UniProtKB/Swiss-Prot annotation:
One of its GO terms (molecular function) is oxidoreductase activity. The keyword Glycoprotein applies. Coiled coil: none annotated. Residues 1-17 form the signal peptide. It comes from Neocamarosporium betae (Beet black rot fungus). The gene is orf1. This is FAD-linked oxidoreductase orf1.
Length: 586
């Protein structure tokens, strides 16, 4: 893949002038963060002084898709060959991971410098940050906090750019880019709360990188299906679902301590025994809102055999659509049997197809999987539904992971998606018919786009998973699955059509699933801001449940000056973005 690296440079007059085009000298409300063109926006000299403080490491935003735009942008020139290569790679995380400013969500990339839309127009920053600091240690964080507080500039924290709620970018922002914090170490951790093997990783380490490192020492760890997600970033802090949840709990349940810099510039450790309220909040309450994470220490677990299974059937081969619906209902009823046995099935439901593309069962064999699935396969046979079922035994979790979510380091998953999440309460297993009806109608073939419900079966109930007191939303503890209402983003389709599909998700698909899952919630890292606008209250219960008010109180305590902001984080309702992207106090 062609590398499109962001350039380390000082502010140049040409770029500065482009940023101000049409808006120079604009006065704003003092309650708003400044953006380029405002009278209070820091001068070139001030940015140059910041660059000197950082020994020349300040990065000026240069969108990589500038190669597709007339005139390019900054140090990047228009280049048709490089544009073609970039478009081929655009759907995959590897195109974004080494950029200080790029994000993977199509909505927050906006169309200001897209390689697909409005390519006849000049490249502008739009929602991208203006500058970034490649964090090398706590001093860089303190420098950024002081600068943004002094000059009223928005502060942003970015790790890998896996961000579907826009928390890691923002118009006119100065970004703390934690990608270069790449340390990895297996340690013998000792504390009153836990003694045993653990891994300490820098904030820039991805889940796949952490897993590879742990496996060299005979361990596995709780990381995400997508290997390029930051292990110590929003993933673990947001809860973190995994193929290993039903055995080892949520990612946040495994965190032992956080090394952070707080809003007032203190460099400290938060654990179950020191700064325990901050530890509680960071472990499940979301990232980017209370402190900047430099490193995380988490449990690792002895590796071993992993039983696996796949299963598929479809409505076309079923005796009738009624039989297919009965099979889906029976699946929901059977699911608790699997997850109670420590298995986590990854499955997709379509209008006419059902697919379990992976079942992860640590400590089990292929024969165990056949035995475990036997009751459900018997149900399919009684319904005269033909199916394809396969099992295997992997000698280690790493080999199983590579076979299902690999190959590492990048894996198979695309970055450009439309989705929103919902947890399926275990209580529905006894009467799932309304759930099945809602799912099949939501993913119907006459809906705009190709939709599916993609789910992971889990059991992280506190009665079977030992975990520290943390801010993981209570909805997780009573769920039997976390699901995505999901469709791929199609860049070949006109922009207006993709906007309409997104609106369909917000107006039709998600409300239908919510209606049949009352009292449940959503994964705070996998949601669409159109579904959860910050000006409404639905996200508070969906993402945090009963923990919200305590988290809001800790925001006031640990960040009284509101140094940090993250969309739909506790306290974020105090802010709103205006029409030009300024972040303003309500």
């Amino acid at each position: 893949m062609k590398s499109f690296a962001t350039t380390v440079l000082l502010v140049t007059p040409g770029i500065y002038a482009a940023a101000l085009s049409g808006r120079q000298g604009q006065a704003i409300n003092s309650s708003c963060k400044v953006i380029p063109g405002d009278t209070a926006w820091p001068s070139r000299q001030i940015w140059s002084q910041l660059n000197d403080t950082l020994d020349g490491r300040l990065i000026q935003s240069t969108p990589q898709a500038a190669v597709c735009r007339p005139g390019g942008y900054g140090s990047i020139s228009e280049n048709g060959t490089e544009c073609t290569t970039l478009k081929e790679d655009w759907d995959y995380a590897k195109a974004f991971l080494d950029s200080a400013v790029e994000i993977m969500n199509p909505w927050y990339q906006n169309t200001s410098c897209s390689p697909f839309y409005r390519v006849d127009q000049p490249c502008t920053l739009g929602n991208y940050v203006s500058y970034a600091i490649p964090v090398s240690g706590p001093e860089d964080v303190v420098t950024a906090i002081n600068f943004t507080q002094t000059h009223n500039v928005r502060l942003v924290i970015k790790n890998t750019g896996h961000d579907y709620l826009g928390k890691s970018t923002g118009t006119g922002g100065l970004s703390l880019w934690t990608h270069n914090l790449q340390s990895k170490q297996i340690v013998n951790y000792t504390s009153p709360a836990y003694s045993g093997p653990a891994i300490k990783v820098g904030a820039g380490v991805t889940g796949g990188e952490a897993l590879l490192h742990a496996s060299q020492f005979g361990y596995r760890l709780v990381s995400g299906d997508c290997s390029t997600v930051g292990y110590a970033g929003g993933y673990s802090s947001g809860g973190g679902h995994s193929l290993l949840n039903s055995v080892h709990g949520m990612a946040a349940d495994n965190v032992l301590e956080w090394e952070v810099v707080t809003a007032d510039g203190r460099h400290l450790v938060a654990s179950a025994t020191q700064n325990s309220d901050l530890y509680w909040a960071l472990s499940g309450g979301g990232a980017g809102n209370l402190a900047v994470v430099l490193s995380m220490t988490a449990k690792v677990h002895p590796d071993g055999l992993v039983g696996a299974a796949t299963l598929s059937f479809n409505a076309t081969s079923s005796p009738s659509n009624t039989s297919y619906i009965s099979a889906i209902n029976a699946w929901w009823t059977f699911l608790p049997t699997l997850i109670d046995a420590g298995a986590s099935p990854s499955f997709n439901i379509y209008t006419n197809n059902f697919l379990i593309y992976n079942t992860t069962a640590p400590g089990k064999s292929a024969q165990d999987m056949s035995t475990l699935y036997a009751p459900y396969l018997s149900t399919l046979s009684s319904l005269s539904i033909p199916y394809t079922f396969q099992t295997y035994t992997a000698p280690s979790f790493l080999q199983h992971y590579n076979a299902t979510d690999g190959p590492l380091p990048y894996g198979p998953y695309v970055a450009s998606q439309l989705f929103n999440s919902r947890m399926i309460p275990r209580s529905l297993s006894s009467s799932p018919s309304n759930l099945t009806t809602a799912i099949l109608s939501s993913v119907a073939t006459d809906a705009p786009g190709i939709w599916q419900l993609g789910c992971l079966g889990i059991n992280v109930n506190s009665t079977r998973i030992s975990h520290p007191d943390n801010a993981v939303a209570p909805h997780w503890r009573t769920a039997m699955a976390v699901c995505l209402e999901f469709s791929l983003y199609d860049w070949a389709i006109p922009e207006e059509e993709m906007v309409a599909r997104r609106q369909h998700l917000a107006d039709v698909i998600h409300p239908a699933i919510v209606k049949v899952t009352p009292g449940s919630g959503a994964y705070l890292n996998e949601a669409d801001p159109l579904v959860y606008p910050v000006g409404e209250d639905g996200w508070k219960d969906a993402f945090y449940g009963a923990n919200y008010e305590r988290l809001r109180g800790l925001k006031r305590e640990w960040d009284p000056e509101r140094v940090f902001y993250a969309y739909t984080a506790p306290g974020s309702e105090e802010w709103v973005s205006d029409a030009e992207g300024r972040l303003c106090r309500v």
